[in-house]
């Protein structure tokens, strides 16, 4: 889970879970929906070469990501937001953000996978060594044993 620790600061995630209580799963669902929309808007703005249209979805994703401890995702969104603002002021399009947008999409997907794993017990991987308990009496029901 080294990678998970690098993508999500679980202390912030758990703090948010504790603060929101029973509403946590619903709010996490909003994060997923808003995040998907923000990533799609950022990609559309890149295709349209519209620097101004990058700012709000990047800003939104930055703030929501930090709320759940997804700092690497927030950092990429912040870079996109800051560079887009600069480019709006300069009257140019930030082509240099293409790798950041690709990274943003990948990080968002990885973050959502980790959040799902942390909140849905069915998605948790089984412990190594098989399933169930080891039976102590293995001769039960066998002839001659």
Spans of features found by a protein language model:
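Amphipathic, coiled-coil-like alpha-helical segments
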Residues: 1-7, 24-32, 38, 64-79, ...
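Extended low-complexity intrinsically disordered regions
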Residues: 1-19
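Solenoid-repeat scaffolds in large eukaryotic assemblies
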Residues: 53-54, 73
């Amino acid at each position: 889970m080294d990678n998970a620790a690098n993508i999500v600061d679980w202390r912030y995630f758990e703090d948010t879970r504790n603060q929101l209580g029973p509403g946590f799963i619903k709010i996490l669902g909003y994060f997923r929906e808003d995040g998907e929309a923000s990533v799609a808007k950022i990609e559309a703005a890149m295709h349209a070469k519209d620097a101004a249209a990058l700012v709000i979805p990047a800003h939104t994703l930055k703030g929501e990501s930090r709320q759940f401890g997804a700092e690497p995702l927030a950092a990429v969104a912040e870079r996109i937001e800051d560079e887009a603002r600069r480019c709006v002021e300069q009257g140019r399009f930030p082509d240099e953000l293409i790798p950041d947008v690709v990274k943003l999409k990948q990080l968002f997907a990885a973050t959502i996978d980790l959040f799902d794993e942390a909140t849905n017990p069915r998605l948790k991987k089984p412990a190594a060594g098989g399933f169930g308990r080891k039976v102590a009496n293995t001769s039960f029901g066998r002839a001659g044993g």
